[in-house]
Amino acid sequence: MSNSESVPHVDPGAAPYGNFPNYYSFNPPENRISLLPAELLHKLFRKPAESDSSTQPLLGLDVGCNTGDLSVALYNHLTEPHSKSSDVPVHFLCCDIDPDLITRARASNPFPDFISYATLDIMDSSAVRGPVNDFLQQFARSTFDIAFCMSVTMWIHLNYGDQGLVTFLGHLANLCDYLLVEPQPWKCYRSAARRLRKLGRQDFDHFHSLSIRGDMAENITQILTAEGAAKLIHIFGNTSWDRSLLLFKIQRHPC
């Protein structure tokens, strides 16, 4: 799919791209936020150079942001007053394939100067290049400090297959220095396929042909860490939905 505007308006129970219209009513942001240490920024990111009179902002990319509830919760969590890094300005670019969800996210955005929303298909490299590059260029940067990929990998995998998942993770790794991933376990794949069948919808093109299956947290870790591309540095436990939060540091190798 090359155009995010072509996302069909489907029964809320189907949502073949994970674009559930009321997603946060049954999976509230607190399910993830409660697992993340309040000092995440302070521990991960470099401090501004003492000789630099300006504070280097922290840039975050949230892929598959839905209506933005989790994006806002992450922003609040990373800038909360008791954090030692709360004086570091934080700017988020948040994207989703569904234009209706992005419209709702923009309408309810409490921090329009710090959180930006864009409708885009993350698998369309030409579509991504514009808004992503434009955002980074505002800060004279080539990568984000951190990217968030929260309950997105399954939808990429089901719609684009094994190679699509590998390509997606590689693309994200190229865009950031740290990557926080919340993979859906394999049982969620079966549930997603079953929902489509119950609604009389066509099954996911790749569901039955996937060879990457089983322990998806382990599979995604293997994909990201292959050939030293990234290092798994922390596992923040499991959410109430039995989903792991995996933090990777992307390894930049000199040419």
From Swiss-Prot:
Tree of life domain: Eukaryota
Keywords: Cytoplasm, Methyltransferase, S-adenosyl-L-methionine, Transferase
GO cellular component, one term: cytoplasm
Any one GO molecular-function label of the UniProt entry: small RNA 2'-O-methyltransferase activity
CDD domains linked to this entry: AdoMet_MTases
Positions of the Bin3-type SAM domain: 41-253
Protein purpose: O-methyltransferase that specifically monomethylates 5'-monophosphate of cytoplasmic histidyl tRNA (tRNA(His)), acting as a capping enzyme by protecting tRNA(His) from cleavage by DICER1. Also able, with less efficiently, to methylate the 5' monophosphate of a subset of pre-miRNAs, acting as a negative regulator of miRNA processing. The 5' monophosphate of pre-miRNAs is recognized by DICER1 and is required for pre-miRNAs processing: methylation at this position reduces the processing of pre-miRNAs by DICER1.
Record protein name field: Pre-miRNA 5'-monophosphate methyltransferase
Organism: Xenopus laevis
